[in-house]
Amino acid sequence: MKTKGALIWEFNQPWSVEEIEIGDPRKDEVKIQMEAAGMCRSDHHLVTGDIPMAGFPVLGGHEGAGIVTEVGPGVDDFAPGDHVVLAFIPSCGKCPSCQAGMRNLCDLGAGLLAGESVTDGSFRIQARGQNVYPMTLLGTFSPYMVVHRSSVVKIDPSVPFEVACLVGCGVTTGYGSAVRTADVRPGDDVAIVGLGGVGMAALQGAVSAGARYVFAVEPVEWKRDQALKFGATHVYPDINAALMGIAEVTYGLMAQKVIITVGKLDGADVDSYLTITAKGGTCVLTAIGSLVDTQVTLNLAMLTLLQKNIQGTIFGGGNPHYDIPKLLSMYKAGKLNLDDMVTTAYKLEQINDGYQDMLNGKNIRGVIRYTDDDR
């Protein structure tokens, strides 16, 4: 079928909304009418080249929610009319990682940047006569998509789509970074550095886990104000102010758990994050840097002598088929504030405006809300 999609044709160029053609669902595939897509910083990394796909053009978008319209042969766990969320990490449940309980590290994830279908290695989307590389096997910046069932999670149909799409990446990643990867325990002091969608979700995770103090570090003033509404106890504009403030509040003990959720991770900043990490504490690097950045500034002696831990994480260490429904059930129960994380809704044609707003610090999370005009 022919529809629209937001593409990039080369690095550092605006998104181009234009006609694309999507194939019909094959074995184990699901066709979805998209209703909402989250505008995550990781898609901007496609533009800058910090996270390059295997080729161009690229169809962006890896957070999304919609309605199943058609299923391919062999699909018996989804049916037309189902409300679903797209998980940016596929999960087969069968590979060694999935069997070991690390479904966020599923072997199917090896193809996240390759653009080839999990089903048969083909390209299922074309534009201007060329194969299109969809972000993380999805490409939610289009009002329709065909995707392998391993990336699809059924949800409660009463959950608004603009909220549901956030748990496909940002909310699950942030919340899981706190409660699972950092393993925040009651009474822990926690610092969150960077307050976009992932950071605000990590903040809520720390509060939910029973943190004593939650220190939020963010240069944008209105985001610091929002952090207080989400449960932060102290806010600081930068890491130097946080160093002094956290030292004063904790009598020099610092934060047992530090979670880094800045827009782009820079190796030169890692040592500064460890200065606010307590002895024996853990610094979780949730943010991602350039795939070619191999330089890290780190005081190795202090890392050893103070027994500090640096831990990477993807998808918050979670299981998409478990965590996505669980987090949405918490939202329904009033235990997770997702409504206030959606700052602005955009049309697909406004995607460049949305990303400029993100870069200007105006959004916690922008969302593309699809209409009939987009289709």
Swiss-Prot record:
| Cellular localization per UniProt | Cytoplasm
Q: Which gene encodes it?
A: adhB
Taxonomy, top ranks, is: Bacteria, Bacillati, Actinomycetota, Actinomycetes, Mycobacteriales
Instruction: Give the protein family.
Output: Belongs to the zinc-containing alcohol dehydrogenase family.
**Would I find Transcription regulation among this entry's keywords?**
no
Which GO terms are recorded in the biological process aspect for this UniProt protein?
formaldehyde catabolic process
Annotated catalysed reactions: a primary alcohol + NAD(+) = an aldehyde + NADH + H(+); a secondary alcohol + NAD(+) = a ketone + NADH + H(+)
How the cofactor is bound: the record states: Binds 2 Zn(2+) ions per subunit.
Q: Which SUPFAM superfamilies match?
A: GroES-like (SSF50129), NAD(P)-binding Rossmann-fold domains (SSF51735)
**UniProt-annotated binding residues for Zn(2+) 1:** C40, H62, C169
The molecular function GO annotations come to: alcohol dehydrogenase (NAD+) activity; S-(hydroxymethyl)glutathione dehydrogenase [NAD(P)+] activity; zinc ion binding
Q: Give its E.C. classification number.
A: 1.1.1.1
Name the domain of life: Bacteria
Major place of localization? cytoplasm
Q: Which InterPro entries match?
A: ADH-like_C, ADH-like_N, ADH_Zn_actinomycetes, ADH_Zn_CS, GroES-like_sf, NAD(P)-bd_dom_sf, PKS_ER
List the keywords (alphabetical): Cytoplasm, Metal-binding, NAD, Oxidoreductase, Zinc
Write down the Pfam families for this protein, in alphabetical order. Answer: ADH_N, ADH_zinc_N
Q: What is this protein called?
A: Alcohol dehydrogenase B
Q: Which cofactor does it need?
A: Zn(2+)
The record lists Zn(2+) 2 as bound by C92, C95, C98, C106
